[in-house]
């Protein structure tokens, strides 16, 4: 058992190292390009997203139900065949892509009402999607491990997500010279995001994706100031700007590629600027948005 676990850890370390190398090779202006996948069956497979050649990270979305009923979890990937995702994860990782799983989302049924609920969710994530193995535990993606967890908490209370972040991050002590479990967050652009501020205060998040959409507190004229506030508040995290790939997602928040490229010339001067997160693969496939960054 110990040898198998060591082999699994070494394998994941190699994959993640390749992903980090891919990140370093991205455009100096754009940085990392992260795409949300799993919101529309017509977006194509995860493998197709990785073969598009425009993304360094794909976030599978969402684990949309947890916490309300102990032991009850729901993975919602909009009708995609779950059994096909595992092989696609391994294929994407072999191409140097990072694959994250987002928890939460819009319209799900989730919360962490207690410390025990945080422990239970940690165990579910570790044994069902990450590097843990336990007899009798169903793994939706088979023997494929995602590279980390994104906290996409869009409803409910703030309590206990800080505890979950600490438990997930603590696994990194088992990995040498690399990050074994990435811990990231997708926040609203208005500072602070009260649902995630306690979790972010741990200082353990590798990345923060700041959504410049679905939040009336961030009109177009304030985007630069909002991003810089987040970047300066969390200097230990790589901070990415979150945008939509089409006005059909959020007409008021949509920035054409030329407008985003202009903004990037200023915000990429932040020392912890990380790149761009785009909602989502379906709309990016239709519009070719990221091809112009």
Swiss-Prot record:
Its main location: secreted. The keyword Glycoprotein does not apply. One of its GO terms (molecular function) is enzyme inhibitor activity. Expressed in mature grain. One of its GO terms (biological process) is defense response to fungus. PROSITE patterns: GH18_2. GO terms for cellular component: extracellular region. Disulfide bonds join 50-92, 189-218. Induction: Induced by exogenous treatment with ascorbate, dehydroascorbate, citrate, sodium chloride and methyl jasmonate in roots. Induced by wounding in roots. It is found in: Secreted. The keyword Metal-binding does not apply. InterPro entries: Cts1-like (IPR045321), Glyco_hydro18_cat (IPR001223), Glycoside_hydrolase_SF (IPR017853), Glycosyl_Hydrlase18_Chitinase (IPR050542). Keywords: Disulfide bond, Plant defense, Secreted, Signal. Residues 1-21 form the signal peptide. Residues 31-293 form the GH18 domain. It comes from the Eukaryota. Fungal xylanase inhibitor. Possesses competitive inhibiting activity against several fungal endo-1,4-beta-D-xylanases belonging to glycoside hydrolase family 10 (GH10) and family 11 (GH11). May function in plant defense against secreted fungal pathogen xylanases. Is similar to class III chitinases, but does not exhibit chitinase activity. Belongs to the glycosyl hydrolase 18 family. Xylanase inhibitor subfamily. Plants silencing XIP do not exhibit visible phenotype under normal growth conditions. PANTHER family: ENDOCHITINASE (PTHR45708), XYLANASE INHIBITOR PROTEIN XIP (PTHR45708:SF11). This is Xylanase inhibitor protein XIP. It comes from Oryza sativa subsp. japonica (Rice).
């Amino acid at each position: 058992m110990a040898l198998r676990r060591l082999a699994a850890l070494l394998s994941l370390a190699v994959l993640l190292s390749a992903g980090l190398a891919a990140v370093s090779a991205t455009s100096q202006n754009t940085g990392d390009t992260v795409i949300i996948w799993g919101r529309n069956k017509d977006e194509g497979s995860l493998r197709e997203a990785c073969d598009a050649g425009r993304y360094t990270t794909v976030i599978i979305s969402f684990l949309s139900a947890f916490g309300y009923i102990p032991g009850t979890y729901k993975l919602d990937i909009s009708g995609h065949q779950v059994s096909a995702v595992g092989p696609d994860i391994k294929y994407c990782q072999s191409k140097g892509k990072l694959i994250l799983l987002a928890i939460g989302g819009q319209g799900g049924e989730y919360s962490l009402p207690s410390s025990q609920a945080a422990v239970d969710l940690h165990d579910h994530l570790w044994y069902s999607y990450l590097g843990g193995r336990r007899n009798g535990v169903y793994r939706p993606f088979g023997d494929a491990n995602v590279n980390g967890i994104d906290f996409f908490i869009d409803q409910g209370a703030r309590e206990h997500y800080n505890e979950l972040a600490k438990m997930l991050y603590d696994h990194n002590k088992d990995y040498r010279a690399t990050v074994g479990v990435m811990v990231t967050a997708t926040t609203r652009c208005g500072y602070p995001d009260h649902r995630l501020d306690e979790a972010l205060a741990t200082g353990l998040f590798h990345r923060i994706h700041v959504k410049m959409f679905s939040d009336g507190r961030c009109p177009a004229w304030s985007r630069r100031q909002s991003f810089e506030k987040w970047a300066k508040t969390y200097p230990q995290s790589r901070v990415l700007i979150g945008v939509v790939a089409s006005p059909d997602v959020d007409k008021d928040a949509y920035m054409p590629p030329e407008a985003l490229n202009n903004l990037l010339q200023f915000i990429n001067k932040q020392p912890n600027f990380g790149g761009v997160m785009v909602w989502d693969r379906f709309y990016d496939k239709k519009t070719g948005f990221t091809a112009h960054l």
